[in-house]
């Protein structure tokens, strides 16, 4: 059967290819003294707190399982708005909040609403691989701009200004980032947003790990940015968020985006046609995420992630898997495996394939599943 050129352009999500191989091997070694240790998939090992689970069960028992509005339950949009006020001191109109089937759906909707054929979107290298495919699916082109450890693997306003061209539509950023766990400094973020706004472009920012910030200097939403002249830049920014990471609901497939008011009707039309609505059960469950007991539990878990980071990164460095920048958020480590590749006789000069081969060697030698950098760039 002929496959569309659009589908052919989409590369495999190699993270999941590694996960499949690890799952097969895990079954073979499950009852040995060296079972598989999974460090590869970007999800918490915590599950939804008890109140959230109970809310889901109650929704099913009460028959609250039919379609909602395409933009989501009004009550949940209100709760999210209240969370922005409580946590960040931001007044976000609930009408700007659109519930989606995970952050991936939010990114897809944003790209389809904003990108025309031939438009270019600037993004850092390394970055989350699916982002460039969301752009491609909207018939746009991703322009990857190399970053360095000195930049915390994030774009600078100077890079954005230098790379901006006649077909540039905007930038797609993530702070904290997958795969580096690093954030954009607020001053730099303001300069980037100002640069983009002055050129009539749009700033999309993935903030799904913002709740897992470990450094107060970086833990603020870009929605609160103010320009040099006092204009509220945040009103022109699209922020993508999710119940997956901080709220520990990965398989529930529920996220949201905060969009400029004028863009919401277009996003709603797309959502009506593509998704009908997000999972109704997940939405009712998510209402309980904002109860005081749930929020307290999330903060305890965030502290646990920081403690793990403080132990894990020095140990990786000691093993020769150098992490050039200490992550300030999320739960990732962007480690340099070239030295380990050399020790194991692997190709250290080709970062993409070297990391791929290293991941499989690690899987088979030590029964540890880790994600190679092949997907992410650089």
Indicate where each model-derived feature is located.
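Conserved small-residue
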Residues: 22-25
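C-terminal edge-of-domain segments
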Residues: 64
């Amino acid at each position: 059967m002929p496959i569309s050129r659009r589908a052919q352009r989409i590369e495999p999500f190699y993270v999941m290819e590694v996960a499949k191989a690890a799952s097969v091997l895990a079954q073979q070694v499950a009852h040995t003294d060296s079972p598989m240790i999974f460090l590869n998939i970007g999800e918490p090992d915590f599950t939804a707190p008890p109140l959230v689970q109970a809310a889901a069960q109650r929704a099913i028992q009460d028959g609250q399982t039919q379609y909602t509005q395409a933009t989501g339950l009004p009550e949940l949009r209100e709760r999210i708005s209240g969370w922005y006020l409580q946590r960040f001191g931001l007044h976000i109109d609930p009408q700007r909040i659109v519930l989606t089937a995970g952050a991936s759906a939010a990114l897809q909707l944003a790209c389809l609403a904003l990108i025309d054929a031939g438009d270019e979107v600037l993004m850092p290298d390394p970055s989350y691989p699916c982002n460039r495919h969301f752009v491609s699916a909207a018939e746009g082109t991703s322009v990857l701009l190399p970053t360095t450890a000195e930049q915390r693997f994030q774009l600078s306003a100077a890079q954005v200004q230098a790379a901006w061209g006649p077909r540039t539509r905007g930038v797609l950023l993530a702070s904290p980032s997958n795969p580096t766990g690093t954030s954009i400094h607020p001053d730099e973020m303001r300069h980037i947003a100002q640069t983009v706004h002055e050129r009539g472009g749009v700033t999309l920012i993935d903030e799904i790990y913002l709740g897992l910030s470990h450094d107060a200097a970086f833990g603020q939403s870009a929605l609160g940015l103010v320009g040099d002249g006092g204009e509220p830049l945040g009103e022109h920014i699209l922020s993508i968020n999710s119940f997956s990471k901080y709220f520990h609901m990965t398989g529930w497939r529920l996220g949201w985006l905060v969009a400029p008011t004028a863009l919401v009707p277009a996003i709603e039309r797309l959502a009506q046609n593509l998704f009908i609505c997000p999972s109704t059960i997940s939405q009712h469950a998510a209402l309980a995420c904002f109860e005081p007991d749930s929020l307290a539990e999330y903060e305890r878990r965030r502290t646990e992630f920081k403690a793990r980071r403080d132990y894990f990164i020095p140990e990786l460095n000691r093993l020769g898997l150098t992490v050039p920048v200490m992550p300030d958020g999320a739960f990732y480590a962007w480690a340099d495996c070239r030295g380990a590749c050399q020790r194991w006789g692997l190709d250290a000069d080709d970062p993409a394939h070297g990391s791929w081969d290293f991941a499989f060697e690690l899987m088979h030698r030590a029964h540890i599943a880790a994600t190679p950098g092949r997907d992410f760039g650089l």
